[in-house]
Swiss-Prot record:
It holds the Pfam family Enolase_N. Coiled coil: none annotated. Its cofactor is Mg(2+). The gene is PGH1. It comes from Mesembryanthemum crystallinum. PROSITE patterns: ENOLASE. Its EC number is 4.2.1.11. This is Enolase.
Length: 444
């Protein structure tokens, strides 16, 4: 049996130049596996703790405490363990080495979700190496998934909200090539729409409007959210993919939810007179008008993470036609997913491994969601690294959808390129989710 010989963590940098954690797991057969953790800009209040150092170095964002926790606490405790035993190792780290709990479960407040996750991801890669199988297959075996499917990519091509320095309140405007017949073709469609969008924006708003945001999407200085949708519609038409490429949105509404329970669509304006504040009901009606006019198939975080009332209304009224995705609402937390399955505020899970902090808990959240008939979208964070784990995760769990930015910026393309390699490796066994992106496989 191959076992863990040592674990080494270090501080590296994410795509925004902020520190993050990377971990190497060395095995006693001389091989090693490496994983790095991403971090988000618009974070949900219910996410597991991302441990930062505070103080003045790195604007308080150093991760030397988390690195130390891996090197001095987690690492030594894992020596001699079998890396193929993912669930046992994750549970040992989360429940015994850390052991902190809040009302939503294991909150990782002692060691940090970033410390635990770096090791959890590296263990998963090491387990695949030991079994001499691809990472996506190892993940499928851990989860008990028999049918692997390549996801539909959701390219975030217009950035607003906390990801961009423009006035746009809503955070992401995405394109999904559901009409492609393979992942390779989906990439072609996405890339061509992206380049058409660039020329449309340049012509309408000038050269500097094609500067890109954190996730590689364009950030033109428009204020009307509808204008973002109109730009996408035009670019899709110009590329010749009307009907084959559809639209998704991530509103990240918690970012502009106010204490009086209104939503401020002008929250980024310095001299804000409050004239753009609207009620949850009015915001719901705005979404419904968008859905009536544009080929929208997915809306993520349409309301604040605690505004379950409007979430539920939206899902009841539009849930058949459009998937309502919970991100800040669910934070990939099995307990919150269970509550949502019981109360119906949404009908899809956004899967972000660093919100919960371990591979095992992420798989649990996905399996629960699939059993409830929900869609699942695997996701990057806005502060990313070159690590491609989520590409394999999306195939291994047959999520059916993945969002990892625009077809621009290497830390985003790293994931998409890995999916191209996986599709090639699977050969004639490769299945692309396409129009079945919400339910690509039977629950496992």
């Amino acid at each position: 049996m191959v076992t863990i010989k040592c674990v080494k963590a270090r501080q590296i940098y994410d795509s925004r130049g902020n520190p993050t954690v990377e971990a190497d797991i060395h095995l006693d057969d001389g091989t090693y596996a490496r994983a790095a953790v991403p971090s988000g800009a618009s974070t949900g209040v219910y996410e597991a703790l991302e441990l930062r150092d505070g103080g003045k170095d790195y604007m308080g964002k150093g991760v030397y405490k988390a690195v130390k926790n891996v090197n001095e606490i987690i690492g030594p405790a894992l020596v001699g363990k079998d890396p193929t035993q993912q669930t046992a190792i994750d549970n040992f780290m989360v429940q015994q080495l850390d052991g902190t709990v809040n009302e939503w479960g294991w909150c990782k407040q002692k060691l940090g979700a970033n410390a635990i996750l770096a090791v959890s991801l590296a263990v998963c890669k090491a387990g695949a190496q030991v079994k001499k199988i691809p990472l996506y297959q190892h993940i499928a075996e851990i989860a008990g998934n028999k049918n692997m499917v390549l996801p539909v990519p959701a390219f975030n091509v217009i950035n607003g909200g906390s990801h961009a320095g423009n006035k746009l309140a809503m955070q992401e405007f995405m394109i999904l090539p559901t009409g492609a017949s393979s992942f390779k073709e989906a990439m072609k469609m996405g890339s061509e729409v992206y380049h058409n969008l660039k020329s449309v924006i340049k012509k309408k708003y000038g050269q500097d409007a094609t500067n890109v945001g954190d996730e590689g999407g364009f950030a033109p200085n428009i204020q009307e959210n509808k204008e973002g949708l109109e730009l996408l519609k035009t670019a899709i038409e110009k590329a010749g993919y009307t009907g084959k490429v559809v639209i998704g949105m991530d509103v990240a509404a918690s970012e502009f939810y106010k204490e009086d329970k209104s939503y401020d669509l002008n929250f980024k304006e310095e001299n804000n007179d409050g004239s753009q504040r609207i009620s949850g009901e009015a915001l719901k009606d705005l979404y419904k008008s968008f859905v009536a006019e544009y080929p929208i198939v997915s809306i993520e975080d349409p309301f604040d993470q605690d505004d379950w009332e409007h979430y539920a209304k939206m899902t009841a009224e539009c849930g058949e036609k459009v998937q309502i995705v919970g991100d800040d609402l669910l934070v990939t937390n099995p307990k919150r997913v269970k509550k949502a399955i019981d109360e119906n505020p949404c009908n899809a899970l956004l899967l972000k491994v660093n919100q919960i902090g371990s591979v095992t808990e992420s798989i649990e959240a996905v399996k629960m969601s699939k059993k409830a008939g929900w869609g699942v979208m695997a996701s990057h964070r806005s502060g990313e690294t070159e690590d491609t784990f989520i590409a394999d995760l999306s195939v291994g769990l047959s999520t059916g959808q993945i969002k990892t930015g625009a077809p621009c910026r290497s830390e985003r393309l790293a994931k998409y390129n890995q999916l191209l390699r996986i599709e090639e490796e699977l050969g004639d066994k490769a299945v692309y989710a396409g129009a079945n992106f919400r339910r690509p496989v039977e629950p496992y």
